[in-house]
Every structure is written in C-alpha cells, then in structure tokens.
Amino acid sequence: MDIEEFVERSIGCWRSQRSGHSLALSHFEEVRSTIDIVDLPKTDHEVKNLCDSSGVDIENAVSPFKMSWEGESDWDENEIIKGSCVLVPIPEDDNLKKGKLLRSQGYAETVSAVGEYYITEDDTFVLYTEYESAAAEEKIWFHTSNLRFRVSLIKTSDGNGVLTASFSSEIRS
C-alpha cells in the first residue's frame, strides 16, 4: 500500500470508539465519535493555503483530504468534541510510501503541523509529528475495508516520556 491507496481506503464516514489513558493525570477516557473523511482537489483553496504556508510546491502534493469529527467523551458528557482539518501528503522523491504530511490542525496541539509518515511492509501507516511542547506518534491499519484500528501516543517534546496513549477501533458507516 502507498499513501494514495491509504487515503482512498480512508475516504468515507467512520464511527470511532477510542479509549485513552492520560498517564500524566492518571485518568481513563472513552470517546465515541463520527469521523468524515473526504478527498479534496489540489485546486481547493484550503489545500493551496496550507501548501503555501508550509513552503511546499502544490505540484508535489498527492491525495489531499479533509477530516471532520464530532463526538462525546465520558469525561465531560456535556461537551461536544468537534473539529476539522485539511491534510496534504507530500511524498519523498516520488516514493509514495514515505514523506511529509501537512496538517492545518495538529493532533497534539491545535496549530498547523508538518509530520513525517511512512507505510510499513504490513501496510501500517505511521505518522510522527513534533510540536513545540510535545510529539505525537500515530499508527493506523486496516483489518478489512470497513474496519481500521488506530494507536496514538502523545510524548514529551524530547520523545522519551509518554503523556497519553489511546486505541481506537473505527467502523465504516
């Protein structure tokens, strides 16, 4: 699998159940959400703006997409967790199995971010993103075309300590 196939397989509406452990707060959280992933053309203004602000030539972009989510947590049942971000893969030297991933909003911090991705021999998508005060590592793999799993770690900025760990199962709806 390469990044184009990974994005193509991800397009759609997913129901997600995530269990997360905050090691810093000794807290467990369960989040149920709906995730919508849609492909975007390179001509989309958000794609262009993200490439421009990241100093990346839009011609190097492949398979841009937008991810939107809405869910609720058992930690605060009155709060709706909601957001969206544009993501633009930039393969490394025509190697679609590794490169950079531009994000209009990061996973660990709500600022734009540039992560490094690669796809393993067993078709696991791995993304590592460094932020100012933390680092995020995400792994996503498909068990079937309608079932995927995601593991996420938020680490200290030096990468040695783990702040949060989560596991998600996502079913295409």
UniProtKB/Swiss-Prot annotation:
Enzyme Commission number, as recorded: 4.-.-.-
Superkingdom as given in the UniProt entry: Bacteria
InterPro entries registered for this protein in UniProt: Calycin, CpcS/CpeS
Keyword annotations from UniProtKB, A to Z: Lyase
Record has Membrane as a keyword: no
GO MF, one annotated term: lyase activity
N-terminal signal peptide: none
Enzyme class: lyase
Family from the record: Belongs to the CpcS/CpeS biliprotein lyase family.
Function: Covalently attaches a chromophore to Cys residue(s) of phycobiliproteins.
Protein name per UniProt: Chromophore lyase CpcS/CpeS 3
Gene it is expressed from: cpcS3
